[in-house]
Regions:
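Hydrophobic pocket/interface hotspot
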Residues: 60-71, 75, 103, 117, ...
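Glycine-rich portal/gate segments that line the openings of hydrophobic small-molecule binding cavities
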Residues: 76, 86-146, 199, 203-214
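Bacterial N-terminal signal peptides
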Residues: 8-19
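Beta-strand/loop substructures that line and gate deep hydrophobic ligand-binding cavities in soluble
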Residues: 133-195
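Hydrophobic ligand-binding cavity/cleft-lining segments
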Residues: 25-95
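N-terminal secretory signal peptides that target proteins for export/translocation
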Residues: 1-6
Length: 214
């Protein structure tokens, strides 16, 4: 085990997600040299590193879904260790939300990423929204090939709704820590996903609950 590599990875990860040298993105547009490429093929769950958070909102599903109309920058909550969203730029016609729609998202540290909707299904009692994120420009995300977000909203039938949000990452196999296989995925989980990223997920769900229950 190369302890020096592990220590360096965790140090750079923490420095990057804390916004060292960050620049506030005033507008959202494709950066110089940007190439809009198809998203990577999504692997099976056993190859991904995942984390799940859930929350109960004291409102029926129909009211919870109205919150989807909020701008992304007002939905994803910035934490002390992760940047927030500063803007969005559509890469396909129409609005973001239908399967196949794609956008560029700008973050408050000056970096960008791409998102595409993979799945959107709704019944009277449930809602599922699944999307892929890739083409990260943040230094902190260099080890990441792509991420997959998956929301499952369920009407509990008593005026409450359960939201379950799972976020999964595929690491680049040729870069550290992905090149260390299962142990590298473990390092990524305990050093980032179950800590700073989980904090962001909880803050976002809490913000949704507060907004919907007003």
């Amino acid at each position: 085990m190369n302890v020096l590599r592990i220590s360096k990875f965790l140090f750079l990860l923490l420095m990057s997600i804390n916004g060292v040298g960050s620049v506030l993105a005033q507008t959202c547009s494709p950066p110089l040299g940007f190439v809009d490429t198809p998203h990577p093929t999504i692997a099976g769950t056993e190859e991904l590193v995942s984390h799940t958070e859930e929350i109960i909102i004291d409102r029926p599903l129909a009211e919870v879904l109205k919150d989807l109309d909020r701008p992304l920058k007002d939905t994803i909550h910035k934490t002390s260790s992760l940047p927030g969203v500063s803007g969005e730029h559509m890469l396909t016609n129409g609005t973001f939300g239908v399967p196949g729609s794609r956008r560029l998202t700008c973050l408050t540290d000056g970096s960008t990423l791409e998102e595409e909707v993979l799945q959107r299904e709704q019944t009277r009692n449930s809602f599922r929204f699944r999307y892929v994120v890739w083409n990260y420009t943040s230094e902190a995300a260099r080890p990441i090939l792509y991420g997959v977000g998956d929301f499952h909203d369920s009407d509990l039938g008593d005026g409450r709704t359960r939201i379950v949000w799972t976020y999964s990452f595929m690491l680049k196999q040729e870069r550290f820590p992905g090149d260390m296989g299962g142990f590298g995925r473990f390092l990524f989980r305990v050093g980032f996903l179950d800590r700073q990223y989980a904090d962001m997920m909880r803050a976002t769900l809490s913000g949704t609950k507060t907004n919907v229950e007003r």
